[in-house]
Regions:
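Flexible loop/turn segments at secondary-structure boundaries
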Residues: 18-20, 49-54, 85-87, 113-118, ...
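Short, ordered loop/turn segments at secondary-structure junctions
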Residues: 14-18, 46-47, 83, 111-112, ...
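Active-site microenvironment of metallo-dependent hydrolases
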Residues: 4, 189-205, 209-478
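Histidine/acidic residue-rich metal-binding segments in metalloenzymes
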Residues: 29, 60-150, 157-178, 187-210, ...
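Short, basic, glycine/proline-bearing loop/turn elements
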Residues: 12-17, 76, 80-82, 123-124, ...
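Divalent-metal coordination cores built from histidine and acidic residues
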Residues: 2-104, 403-407
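A generic structural signal for well-ordered alpha-helical segments
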Residues: 2-3, 34, 98-101, 121, ...
Length: 478
């Protein structure tokens, strides 16, 4: 019954064309639209705008910019601290943000961080992490003093790898919570949201009460929401009435003592025009997607089913100089800068995505939210990019050299203002078609795609500047 919203995607985009005025306008729009909603909405100030110094995003959001937000009653703290190398090296701006938010909740983002580096990260003030992919990693971070959010979204699914460890060592459960970290409305419709995580944990052997605590009181305590998360005197009457606790079959929902009518019509607010028309691409042409190597070797982003981590590979495709052409094993990926029309385009190769006979593209690509596209031919990839320029953002799928469908996301290229049903139908249709075109069932076509541009998750990513090695902190050059 409450959501803790890290607004970094909005700030990444809004700042580029409207400064703090645009960010403020967005905040006012959301809070006003949610005022009558049966949901408590809280905000984390974005810590990582940009996520790293070598990102090509729309803005900087400094500690000085944060001061006007810090004491707002709905602001709980600092959003996930993405660039842990900056914390370890005590980079000036991130240390100012950590100091500003001392005493508040500070979320983390530390995939694979361990040992002395983990201790230094925690000692800097970071309190949570949601990037654990194994119980061993989660346990080490918990013992270092962190609270752990076990993630189960559309792309990254970690409950099955972590919960069995908690069942064996239940003394750690009080320090664990659940999150989704990007989940398609299509998957929410089919599976549920946090209730799906609870349901899955119970099936993996966790006591139902422990699983429910991870979804309720543990989260409320972590984020300092003292009147939420329990059924007791002095707590807000946010309740679920279940038909079956084992299967988490929800009969009724109460928010602040009021029963929620699940059949009531949802009113979609008209978004201010100032929050639209934010996709600004330089002179883009199909030739910008050409990828050649002087020695015939290429770096490859190997995608993994059920994860958003990648594996770094280098493959020899030619005996000498050559231009890459996609095949059954390797497809092309590109990221096109869309905030300031710089004309920058990074091009690379992926394996494991599998799409054949077309291309898929999105203006949602963490964290800078440039346009990202994967395809098996340059013409369809270019068509996908042009389609998103035309719609000023969205998800699109190209099949057989034609636009199969597009879900427009006109609000900063990140969100739809057309309502749930419209978005759900469009997205479902494209996801099903993408799987028909070869995308494996273990990969969420649009969400997994969106994480390929996030240069703080190992091992290898792509930005408008090119292929980036997260482990070495270097861009590859051909």
């Amino acid at each position: 019954t409450f959501a803790d919203d890290d607004i970094y995607p909005v700030v990444n985009v809004a700042e580029s064309w409207g400064g703090l005025r645009a960010t403020t306008q967005w905040g006012e729009f959301v809070l006003d639209a949610a005022g009558d909603a049966p949901l408590g909405i809280y905000v984390m100030m974005p810590s990582s705008i940009p996520a790293t110094p070598f990102e090509t995003n729309g803005a900087d959001f400094t500690a000085e910019d944060m001061k006007q937000w810090k004491d707002h009653p709905l602001v709980l703290g600092l959003g996930e601290v993405m660039c842990y190398p900056a914390v370890l090296s005590k980079e000036e701006q991130i240390m100012k943000k950590l100091e500003l938010c001392k005493g508040m909740v500070i979320d983390g983002h530390a995939p694979g961080l361990s040992g002395e580096d983990l201790k230094a990260y925690v000692e800097a003030g970071v309190m949570t992490d949601h990037e654990c992919t194994s119980f061993e990693e989660a346990k080490e971070k918990c013992l270092a003093g962190m609270k752990i959010l076990v993630r189960e979204g559309s792309a990254a699914r970690n409950v099955e790898n972590i919960v069995p460890g908690l069942v064996k060592e239940p003394e750690f459960i009080a320090h664990f919570m659940f999150c989704t970290d990007d989940k398609h409305i299509e998957d929410i419709e089919q599976e549920g949201h946090i209730d799906h995580n609870v349901r899955k944990a119970i099936k993996l052997g966790m006591d139902p009460i422990d699983a429910i605590c991870m979804a309720t009181i543990n989260s409320a305590k972590c984020y300092g929401l003292r009147r939420l998360g329990a059924v007791a005197t002095g707590y807000q009457a946010d309740l679920l009435v279940l038909d079956d606790i084992e299967n988490m079959t929800i009969h009724d929902v109460y928010y602040n003592g009021q029963r929620i009518d699940q059949d009531s019509e949802i009113t979609v607010r008209e978004c201010p025009v100032e929050l639209k028309n934010t996709v600004h691409v330089g002179n883009f042409a199909v030739d910008d997607l050409t990828l050649e190597s002087p020695d015939g070797s290429f770096y490859v982003i190997e995608m993994q089913e059920g994860e958003i981590t990648t594996v770094r590979k280098r493959v020899q495709l030619f005996d000498g100089p050559g231009v890459f052409r996609a095949d059954e094993d390797y497809q092309k990926i590109a990221v096109i800068e869309r905030h300031k029309a710089t004309g920058k385009t990074g091009v690379g190769i992926v394996s494991g995505f599998g799409i054949r006979g077309g291309a898929i593209a999105s203006s949602v690509s963490h964290d800078s939210h440039n346009i990202i596209v994967i395809g098996d031919n340059d013409q369809d990839m270019a068509l996908a990019v042009q389609e998103l320029i035309r719609t000023q953002g969205g998800y699109t799928l190209i099949a057989d050299h034609k636009v199969f469908d597009t879900l427009e996301l006109p609000v900063m290229g990140l969100m739809s203002d057309a309502g749930f049903r419209y978005s759900h139908i469009k997205l479902k249709r494209m996801i099903e078609k993408a799987h028909e075109m070869g995308v494996p069932d273990g990969i969420a076509p649009f969400i997994t795609l969106s994480f390929m541009a996030l240069p703080v998750i190992p091992e290898i990513r792509i930005t408008p500047r090119g292929i980036y090695d997260v482990c070495t902190g270097e861009f590859y050059k051909y």
